[in-house]
Amino acid sequence: MSSSEVDKVFTEEQEALVVKSWAVMKKNSAELGLKFFLKIFEIAPSAKNLFSYLKDSPIPLEQNPKLKPHAMTVFVMTCESAVQLRKAGKVTVRESNLKRLGAIHFKNGVVNEHFETRFALLETIKEAVPEMWSPEMKNAWGEAYDQLVAAIKSEMKPSST
């Protein structure tokens, strides 16, 4: 493992919990992605300013035509990354995508506080699969999220393109 990767191990049990819950959530990823982002904006209203199409828009967030597709993409990428974590031993977002994500977050002025979306993700998952939710599942998704954030942060620098 390189120094840019998180040294924590994602266990087989954690993987099973993430895979099982993602299998249930996947079919609703558009709605869940939107819920995730609405929770983020509830927790950190200033995060809306990071999105040019939300900044001065009079359209309610949940009706914004650009937010739902973006939210779904982010939610699916986050969950798919979590599912692959143990098998790959690291975050599996393609390196080019990781570099692009890092550069975009850097360019848009995303700071550490903006990554405090962990709670929003965990709450979204908890509400999506209440019958499966447990402290172990919370820890599994939390660990996967932490590793993805660490990978993105390691690429947060100006784009080389």
Curated annotation (Swiss-Prot):
Cofactor(s) of this protein: heme b
Site (Homodimerization): K138
Molecular-function GO terms, alphabetical: heme binding; metal ion binding; oxidoreductase activity; oxygen binding
Class in the EC hierarchy, top level: oxidoreductase
Motif (Homodimerization): 42-46, 112-123
Subcellular compartments: Cytoplasm; Nucleus
CDD domains for the chain: class1_nsHb-like (cd14784)
Co-factor: note: Binds 1 heme group per subunit.
Keywords per UniProt: Cytoplasm, Heme, Iron, Metal-binding, Nucleus, Oxidoreductase
Pfam families according to UniProt: Globin
Any coiled-coil regions, as ranges: none
Domain Globin: 9-157
Enzymatic reactions: Fe(III)-heme b-[protein] + nitric oxide + H2O = Fe(II)-heme b-[protein] + nitrite + 2 H(+)
Enzyme nomenclature, EC number: 1.7.2.-
Binding positions for heme b per the UniProt entry: S52, K66, H70, R100, H105
Function of the protein: Phytoglobin that reduces nitrite to nitric oxide (NO) under anoxic conditions (e.g. during flooding or in waterlogged soil) and upon root nodulation. Required for general plant development and during nodulation, especially for the onset of symbiosis. Monitors nitric oxide (NO) levels during early phase of the nitrogen-fixing symbiosis and buffers oxygen in functioning nodules. May not function as an oxygen storage or transport protein. Has an unusually high affinity for O(2) through a hexacoordinate heme iron because of a very low dissociation constant.
Name of the molecule in the record: Anaerobic nitrite reductase GLB1
Organism: Trema tomentosum
Taxonomy of the source species: Eukaryota, Viridiplantae, Streptophyta, Embryophyta, Tracheophyta
